[in-house]
């Protein structure tokens, strides 16, 4: 029984420590968010699907900077014009430490974070005006580590686009689900070498 309790304590300590190892200076974050996805179930129902691949480098512990690409397609109902959305820009993330005031770690297997982005994006509507503008967004999220290097993420984010043309500010609040792979620098170099060979 003592061995079982000791093994449990070691496992819990190891899992708690893995929530910090991923977000250290020099590591890489690669992942994607499924921005929104819905399909109309009624006759003539529409759909909205978007994906956001992203990559970032930890410039210091708990702080990552990188870039993203936004791609999406939207059709409100059958017969309505199809809308294609796109964007590219920079992003930043700050992971909250469990010791910071007001921060509690859910099950000790993940981390809360704040994410912000700025870039250029737009939309192209079938047989209608298209626009390009300044994309921006910010919001809190949580990364739950299912393994030491893979996190499932949820993010509530305010997203806005200030059009450069006749279109003004468009904004909404999105709920994002996705995943991220956290690679130590040595592992990232191995992957890059494997791709070259």
Stretches with model-predicted labels:
Residues 57-136:
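Gram-negative (and chloroplast) outer-membrane scaffold detector with strong preference
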Residues 88-97, 170-197:
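Outer-membrane beta-barrel "beta-signal"
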Residues 39-49, 76-83, 125-133, 163-170:
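Solvent-exposed loop/turn segments connecting transmembrane beta-strands
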Residues 37, 72-74, 119-123, 159-163, ...:
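Structural signature of outer-membrane beta-barrel domains
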Residues 51-57, 69-71, 90-94, 118-120, ...:
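Residues on the lipid-exposed face of transmembrane beta-strands in outer-membrane beta-barrel proteins
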Residues 22-27, 62, 97-112, 146-150, ...:
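Short loop/turn motifs that connect adjacent beta-strands in outer-membrane beta-barrel proteins
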């Amino acid at each position: 029984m003592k061995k079982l309790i000791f093994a449990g304590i070691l496992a819990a300590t190891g899992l708690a420590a893995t929530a910090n190892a991923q977000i250290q200076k020099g590591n890489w974050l690669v992942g994607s968010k499924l921005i929104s996805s819905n399909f109309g179930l009624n006759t003539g129902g529409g759909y909205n699907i978007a994906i956001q691949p992203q990559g970032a480098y930890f410039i210091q512990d708990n702080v990552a900077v990188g870039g993203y690409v936004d791609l999406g397609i939207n059709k409100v109902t059958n017969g309505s014009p199809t809308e294609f959305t796109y964007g590219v820009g920079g992003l930043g993330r700050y992971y909250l430490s469990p010791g910071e005031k007001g921060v509690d770690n859910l099950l000790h297997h993940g981390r809360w974070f704040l994410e912000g982005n700025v870039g250029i994006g737009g939309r192209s509507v079938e047989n209608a005006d298209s626009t390009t503008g300044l994309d921006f967004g910010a919001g809190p999220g949580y990364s739950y580590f299912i393994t030491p290097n893979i996190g499932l993420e949820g993010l509530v984010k305010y997203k806005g686009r200030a059009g450069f043309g006749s279109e003004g500010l468009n904004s909404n609040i999105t709920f994002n689900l996705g995943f991220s792979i956290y690679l130590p620098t040595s592992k990232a170099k191995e992957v890059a070498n494997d791709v070259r060979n």
